Amino acid sequence: MFRVSGNQISITAGDTALMAICPDETGYVPTANDRAIFTVRERPKRRTLIEKTIAPEADGRFVVCFESEDTARLKPREYVWDVRLAIQANVDENGEVTDAEQIITPCPPGILFVMAAIGELSGAANNGFGQPVNQTLRIRFEKLMQGPRGEPGRDGAKG
């Protein structure tokens, strides 16, 4: 089972799923040089359990791929997640962000509910990534625009 409702994500331990994080039509549309960093932790400021650095699709959306191993080892309970946008990011050879022009958090942190899997699978299962995105989370990305002295920039007021 996989479901997204507001900032709450529910997934069965060991399942695979795709979730699109889409820019709001009126906000900033990510470019090829931007990256989203999706992170799941036990609680805020605790150890990272899942971290994915994602390049945007051509339309500006980011697709988070939940692999089976991402959630299979997690105990059934609540975790916290957030997504941060690295604008004009520099990445290393592993695709991890090393520096960025700006880092923004476009939405409040959310809750990830991991539920216990009742049945067992025999053999390899199709991970379903050939399928369309299961759920969509629409977020307004706001890029900080300002002039050299901090005045409002041509694309909007200072954050």
Identify the meaning behind each predicted range.
Residues M1-N126:
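N-terminal assembly/attachment segments of tailed bacteriophage virion structural proteins
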